[in-house]
Amino acid sequence: MIIANKQIKIYYNDNDNSNTLPVIILNNFEEQINEIITECRHINSKEFILVEITNINWNKEMSPWKITSLFKNEEPYLGNADEYLKVLETEIIPEIEKKIEKNNKKVKYYAIAGYSLSGLFGLYSVYKTDKFKKIITASGSMWYPNLENYIKENKISSKVESIYFSLGDKEKISKNPILKSVEEKTKLIQEYLSNKVKTIYEENEGNHFNETAKRIAKGIKWSLEN
């Protein structure tokens, strides 16, 4: 279905009789819902409802503030995360909730998940809203300039219970000085936030684009258990 010009897909396990389930909101660059669900089943995750949102203006809507492009011919990072978050909270989630209720389900809580820049968006969002109890940031863009300072200078939502961080072990190998800081900054942010909420940092094999659905699924499984 289409809500606010975004493509929305909702997954339910029709064989599960639970009435109240966690709902995971996944902002994604491309449609992967079937791959992610397959991976979740393979690793025996707990039951949940997955909402995948695509057709996102990636560098515009997932970025918290403006920065210059990292590469030639790359779209600029325009810093419209606040505007998109408002649309997510006031337009998209209410419609999703209606759809869930029509299927005789209830929302236990909301979690927010993302990969790469949308992993950054998920973490940033809990400094702006109390909507989400859990965050899954798989290979998240923790390299983003000034992010570490923002996290230290602002207050995370008191509703947050856990945050999952992961990276590929080769992601720090980059000629770009900003991108090559991703592992160092991810670990620093995870360590800082571990004093406030339950966190984990998990390292996977490969670069940024390796087994993305599997990495998201691993984050979902951990989040549902923590």
Label every model-predicted segment.
Residues 124-134:
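Conserved hydrolase catalytic core segment
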Residues 142-223:
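The feature captures the conserved acid-bearing segment of alpha/beta-hydrolase catalytic domains
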Residues 1-22, 199:
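A domain-start/cap signature at the N-terminus of enzymes
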Residues 113-118, 122:
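Gly/Ala-rich beta-loop-alpha elbow adjacent to hydrolase catalytic centers
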Residues 9, 19-102:
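Serine-hydrolase catalytic machinery in alpha/beta-hydrolase-like enzymes
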Residues 37-41, 125-126, 190:
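A conserved amphipathic alpha-helix that caps or lines the catalytic cleft of carbohydrate-
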Residues 109-114, 138:
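Short beta-strand immediately N-terminal to the catalytic nucleophile in serine-hydrolase-like folds
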Residues 25-28, 139, 167:
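The conserved beta1-alpha1 loop
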